[in-house]
């Protein structure tokens, strides 16, 4: 999720979209196994949604970057263009996290899930989760 939210072109290493694991100690060919027919899975679906959000968001493609909240396990940053603001929120912890910050608006839509998000009372991030909140203007 971080790669798709940050400025620049996201890079997904060959096989990562399928959740393939490899050991680098076995050499470079082990990192690029052949796929006869990869199986679409939960990770593939998530990466597909991230790519779709990036593709369709002016802010994620061309917007400025501003750090909003940073801990050892969570980060929230804003990408803003002339027409759009998106808050990228990531929780890399096994516990839920409630973030308190000034969003500058009351509601947003998560570009990953399509669900509305209410900033009132804090923003809860489930364990090991990400959200791309497109802010209402």
Annotate each predicted stretch with a short phrase.
Residues 1:
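Active-site region of glycoside hydrolase catalytic domains
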Residues 4-137:
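Carbohydrate-interacting/catalytic domains
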């Amino acid at each position: 999720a971080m790669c798709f939210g940050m400025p620049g072109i996201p890079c997904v290493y060959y096989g990562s979209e399928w959740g393939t694991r490899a050991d680098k100690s076995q050499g470079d060919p082990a990192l690029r196994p052949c796929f006869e027919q990869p199986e679409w899975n939960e990770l593939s679906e998530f990466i597909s949604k991230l790519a779709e959000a990036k593709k369709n968001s002016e802010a994620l493609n061309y917007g400025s970057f501003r750090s909003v909240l940073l801990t050892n396990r969570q980060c929230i940053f804003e990408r803003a263009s002339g027409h759009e603001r998106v808050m990228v929120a990531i929780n890399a912890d096994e516990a839920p996290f409630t973030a308190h910050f000034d969003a500058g608006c009351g509601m947003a839509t998560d570009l990953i899930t399509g669900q509305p998000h209410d900033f009132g009372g804090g923003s809860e991030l489930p364990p090991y989760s990400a959200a791309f909140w497109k802010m209402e203007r």
